[in-house]
């Protein structure tokens, strides 16, 4: 149990918590907590209204300030990244919509080339205005992380060498490498309600070119 219990919930709108009288520890300072669930695009305007005490900062507003609010930077405790299917196109789909497998990303050379070719620090600077640190394994900050798993990224020449060694070459001069008649082109999906993931997908795609 915790110091608060759910008192009222409006699905998709808010959740109100009150003090848990049966909590074994000290009573909290605040007698009530109200958590709102606004769209990310409205976070900044919500702060400007002065109607909330704490509000997340969208990536598009990281360099902006709001009177009466102090910017506090905390570790998110999670990593953001791009993941690829490891298996070839199975011909099946999930929920009748999403294809299972991809003939391009299933090739190890493609994944390795993208891993060393993209520049993570540039992504942190462009998307998060420097309020982020590069992540290489998704568990870099954990006690069980393996520092040897990190790679030197931003090395386009090495990425090209990996692709060539793996049999991927641009034989028709269109700027896209291919192998066995398959072009190294694929769709990259992101949830539209998360602006940071949209930005990550966009910047990643530009670097991958």
Language-model features, listed with the residues they occupy:
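Extracytoplasmic/periplasmic ligand-capture domains
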Residues: 3-127, 143-175, 180-209
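Short, solvent-exposed turn/loop segments enriched in Gly/Ser/Thr/Pro and often Arg
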Residues: 127-133
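Short secondary-structure junction motifs
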Residues: 30, 134-136
């Amino acid at each position: 149990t915790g110091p608060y219990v759910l008192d009222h919930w409006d699905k998709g709108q808010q959740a109100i918590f009150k003090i848990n009288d049966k909590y074994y520890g000290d009573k909290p300072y605040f007698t009530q907590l109200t958590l709102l669930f606004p769209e990310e695009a409205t976070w900044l305007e919500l702060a400007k209204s002065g109607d909330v005490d704490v509000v997340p900062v969208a990536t598009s507003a990281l360099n902006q300030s709001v009177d009466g609010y102090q910017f506090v930077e905390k570790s998110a405790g999670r990593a953001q990244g791009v993941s690829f299917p490891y298996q070839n196109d199975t011909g099946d789909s999930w929920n009748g919509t999403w294809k299972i497998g991809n003939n391009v990303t299933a090739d190890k050379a493609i994944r390795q080339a993208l891993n060393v070719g993209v520049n993570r620090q540039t992504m942190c600077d462009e998307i998060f205005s420097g309020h982020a640190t590069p992540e290489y394994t998704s568990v870099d900050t954990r006690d069980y992380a393996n520092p040897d798993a990190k790679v030197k990224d931003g090395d386009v020449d090495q990425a090209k060498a990996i692709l060539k060694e793996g049999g991927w070459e641009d034989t028709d001069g269109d700027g896209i490498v291919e192998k066995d008649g398959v072009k190294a082109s694929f769709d990259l999906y992101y949830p539209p309600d998360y602006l940071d993931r949209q930005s990550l997908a966009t910047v990643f795609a530009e670097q991958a070119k």
